[in-house]
Amino acid sequence: LVGIGGMGNVHFNCYKKIKNAELVAVCDVRKDFALERVGSACPVYTDIDEMLKNEEIDVVDICTPSYLHAEMAVECLNKGLNVLCEKPMTLTCADAEKVLAAAESSGKKFMVAHVVRFMPQYAFLKKVTDEGKLGKLISLDMRRLSSVPRWSWENWMQDEQKSGGVCLDLSVHDIDFVQSVLGMPERVSASYRPLKNDSSFIKSTLYY
């Protein structure tokens, strides 16, 4: 597990409940902070290269700040490791292509940790849509509101160049679910207002 901040800690507590998974190491640049959360559960590292060198690892779970996802994912895939990565996958299309290329060339699995599609109510909607029990789904309206995140390390989430802002950090949940139900859209239109005075906005329309 790389990064044990907000989402990293959530993942850490989930791994403790999975009987057929063994968490072999945690890596975070804040060693004292990590030790406080991990305790004696597993070794703690501050350097990902040292962790990958010393431990026998099947899967690396990347829960670092978003702007670090691409570099770490490519490194782990190139070392022959499967990767689970917190959303967003990357902050640019170019970096996403690099990650996909590394996954393809390595033959290893890469998954973005989109959680919404696995939530019971969302999974049920997809199931009845796939089965056609309620007829054809012709429109899907999804809305999401959130306060500005103020809990991140060094406030990186408030920097849209590091987090991707409301588009890649928040709206991405709904975009992923829509695509899981309806597939890739034929075209997309969107309007966006950058973060200003604690307010940001995006409206996306996916056409099928």
What are the residue ranges of the model-derived segments?
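Rossmann-fold dehydrogenase core element
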Residues: 97-115, 135-140
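Short, conserved structural micro-motifs that define repeat-unit consensus positions
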Residues: 2-11, 62-63, 142-146
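Short active-site oxyanion
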Residues: 21-25, 58-60, 164-165
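Beta-loop-alpha module in the N-terminal Rossmann-like domain of NAD(P)-dependent dehydrogenases
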Residues: 11, 43-102
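Predominantly a Rossmann-like dinucleotide-binding segment in NAD(P)-dependent oxidoreductases
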Residues: 116-196, 204
